[in-house]
Swiss-Prot record:
This is Putative cysteine ligase BshC. It comes from Myxococcus xanthus (strain DK1622). GO terms for molecular function: ligase activity. It is an enzyme of class 6 (ligase). InterPro entries: Bacillithiol_biosynth_BshC (IPR011199), CC_BshC (IPR055399), Rossmann-like_BshC (IPR055398). HAMAP family: BshC. Keywords: Ligase. The gene is bshC. Its EC number is 6.-.-.-. The keyword Ligase applies. It holds the Pfam family Rossmann-like_BshC. It comes from the Bacteria. Belongs to the BshC family.
Length: 557
């Protein structure tokens, strides 16, 4: 199979980018660029970022742990070469990362990894410095409902949601590094096989998943096993920060967050206020006076809590069932004695990452780019330069099934990205044997005629009694509501006219606009790997990534 790609013209539509800040930033709006420069677009700025990163080295302790963590993954001479490069002065890193979604989670996980690999290649070619792609495993996060499932399109149409049965998922606060898959992964795998086993390349990919996703495995371990297999040829390096051997290396960053909590919350609050004044939504809320670290008081693998200032020299544990508090001295003692009790927040994680690694660039999605707009004061206070922020590649896959269904209903892919009833109404009025008026035209004609007549007689009625002006306005409002109600019923009736068209529309929306969101944010890899081939699909995604772009493209097998 060969892929073609074409750039989409709706790159900045609300369907393509979900963050208002990211939309403005990708468009090059001056207000957005004042918070986060688009240095990734400029060769000279890229060279400066690489040179700055090259002046920093990876510590021997981190290199040892990286070697051990990656040694348990799928064999990869390319990864071994990249690990050796990280030990050499002058090597830089391009970093990306993601939560550990079931069966790799949404497609954008793959796109992030591919974007980091292609960006690293491009920076190395452009600057002559060794550049290594690193995938930061976000194992400190505790948001299970975001990662305990995977959605695939059924080959015959309709979505199939595969999920782990984790009774405490909604309330769990423990880092997912410690979460085992459990027995419910087996029926999820069985359902996946039943849905996809007829696809031409199913056995290869399903066997890979079944080897990795075992009940005794952790979410993070299974995720890493699969993703490392996909990018073994490219040498993608993996870093899991939730490692007891790395906790002492993280302690200085947490100490900084604790000691500078007041100052950091002040400068970050000022930044948030400036973003709000500029019309942007603040991605990460900063609590007044709170440090950017989480603390696990009960066990190293137990729930983690934010800290709020309580009385003098003490912190309350936000959300703790016993409303517990801890003194400043006890907190610092815990950091010295058991640093693994501390984990990073969304704003502190980048600083930890760039303290450990010679990061020249971070490749992120729209949400991450939005919170990167908040980070400059944090990095300035820490005395560290920010890396380049680079948007990941974005794709929409149009396989042969989707193209066939589009042809049957005579639609272009972008025409599917509208509400279901509106699309069905359009098809009904377009394809009806008799001429049918659209709901919008009907409403305009009915109410327009009434409003015109009402306006014509309004003067005459008011001349008889000026108090009737209120009655005229009420009548106009009543008729508008009645016409809108009639139009709504007409629209729904049109949408119900053709059951076949409705079925085709539902299939297409499942493939191209599932849950009214971009395909890459909802659908997972299993369907596409089973239909197209694991390596074939991965390789074509790599080939379609354009460095320093962030464009949205259609992939057409």
């Amino acid at each position: 199979m060969h892929f073609r790609w074409r750039a989409r013209r709706d790159l900045l539509s609300r369907h393509a980018v979900t963050s208002p800040f990211s939309t403005a930033w990708l468009r090059g709006d001056a207000s957005a660029l004042s918070f986060l420069p688009d240095d990734y677009r400029h060769r000279e700025a890229r060279a400066r970022a690489v040179a700055a990163a090259a002046s920093r080295a990876v510590s021997p302790a981190l290199l040892d742990v990286l070697g051990a963590q990656n040694a348990r993954l799928a064999p990869s001479p390319a990864r071994e070469r990249n690990l050796a490069l990280l030990a050499k002065p002058g090597t830089v890193a391009v970093v990306t990362g993601q939560q550990m979604g079931l069966f790799l989670g949404p497609l954008y996980t793959l796109y992030k990894a591919a974007s980091a690999i292609v960006t690293a290649r491009a920076l190395q070619e452009e600057t002559g410095r060794p550049c290594v792609p690193v995938f930061w495993l976000q194992t400190e996060d505790h948001d299970l409902p975001e990662i305990d499932h995977c959605v695939i399109p059924r080959p015959g149409g309709g979505p199939c949601r595969l999920a782990l049965e984790l009774p405490d998922a909604a309330t769990s606060r423990a880092p997912i590094a410690h979460r085992h898959l459990g027995p419910s992964v087996l029926p999820a795998l069985a359902t996946l096989r039943a849905e996809l086993e007829a696809e031409p390349h199913a056995e290869e990919f399903l066997s890979l998943l079944e080897r990795a996703y075992r009940p005794e495995a952790t979410l993070a371990g299974a995720f890493t096993d699969v993703l490392s297999s996909l990018f073994a040829d490219e040498g993608l390096v993996f870093l899991d920060p939730r490692d007891a051997r790395l906790a002492p290396l993280a302690a200085p960053v947490h100490r900084f967050a604790l000691q500078e909590a007041g100052a950091l919350s002040s400068v970050l609050a000022a930044r948030a206020e400036a973003l709000t004044r500029a019309g942007y939504t603040v991605q990460v809320h900063v609590r007044p006076g709170s440090p950017l670290s989480f603390f696990s008081p009960d066990a190293l693998d137990g729930p983690r809590y934010r800290l709020d200032p309580a009385e003098a020299d003490a912190w309350s544990l936000v959300g703790h069932p016993e409303s517990s508090a801890i003194t400043q001295d006890a907190l610092h003692a815990a950091l010295e004695r058991e640093p693994l009790r501390f984990t990073t927040s969304a704003l502190l994680r980048p600083l930890l990452q760039d303290t450990w690694l010679p990061t020249a660039a971070y490749v992120g999605g729209p949400g991450e780019l939005a919170y990167f707009a908040q980070l400059a004061p944090l990095y300035a206070h820490a005395g560290r330069p920010m890396p380049l922020a680079i948007p990941r590649a974005r794709f929409r896959v149009l396989d042969d099934r989707a193209r066939r269904w589009l042809g049957k209903v005579g639609l272009q892919p972008d025409e599917v990205n509208v509400p279901r009833d509106a699309l069905l109404t359009r098809l009904a009025t377009r394809d009806a044997p008799e001429s049918l008026e659209t709901p919008e035209a009907l409403e305009a004609r009915l109410f327009g005629a009434f409003a015109s007549e009402l306006e014509r007689v309004a003067g005459q009625v008011s001349a008889v009694d000026a108090n009737l002006q209120d009655a005229l306005r009420r009548t106009q409002g009543t008729v508008r509501v009645a016409v809108s109600r009639l139009t709504g019923r007409y629209r729904r009736a049109l949408a119900r006219r053709d059951a076949t068209a409705a079925e085709q529309v539902d299939r297409l929306r499942t493939f191209l606009f599932p849950e009214d969101a971009p395909q890459e944010r909802i659908l997972g890899l299993p369907y596409f790997a089973c239909r197209i081939g694991t390596r074939a699909f991965t390789k074509r995604v790599l080939d379609a990534c354009v460095p320093f772009s962030g464009d949205s493209k259609d992939l057409t097998p």
